[in-house]
Amino acid sequence: GSICQHRYKAVQSYGRHLPLLKAKPERQDQLRREYLQHGQPAERLIGISWRGGGKGVRIQQKSILPEQFAQLLQPIPGVRFVSLQYGNAGPTVAQWRQQGLDVIHDGRVDPLKQMDLWLAQVAACDAVLSVANTTIHGAGGLGTPTLCLLSLHSDWRWFHDPAVTRSYWYPSVGIAREQKQAGWSEAMAQARIWLEQGCPQPSGPVSSLPA
């Protein structure tokens, strides 16, 4: 966990050697074709993850309730959402689908046991929207346009300055922060706008530290 202090001496040193990860192209292409043709054909795939990792209260602190996250999944022409969530995500996706939301859960992919297959699933997506968990690191390592819904209880890697709107680890990862007073409302609004604008690559400062 402390290797970065020896390898990188300044914030500007991060993010210069991307992509850090590469998926198997044949598996990536296969999954993408299947997902786009699932039901009514779609044009774009957005990977999603709403539950954080850890133990006990830490999971709750990093997560967004499914009924709240569903607000982000309201239909956008040509867009299909793909669950990248590890753990027992199937029942939640089934509930969303009953509500008419276009979300896929691929039961063949277990991120906790099949990391290579899961990474191909992430790479099959055009963009990713996720809370801060392994999904962010997979998407960021691939260089996929990503928006991180960042909890107030985030750790040192993300900085706590609200002026920081992009990850210095992964230049393709933007940050929408939970706020002390407003909760998730402003971050959710920011995320929905990002989705409707086609999930552009993020811009903005990666640090409030002097260069």
Which role fits each region the language model picked out?
Residues 1-211:
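Catalytic machinery of carbohydrate-active enzymes
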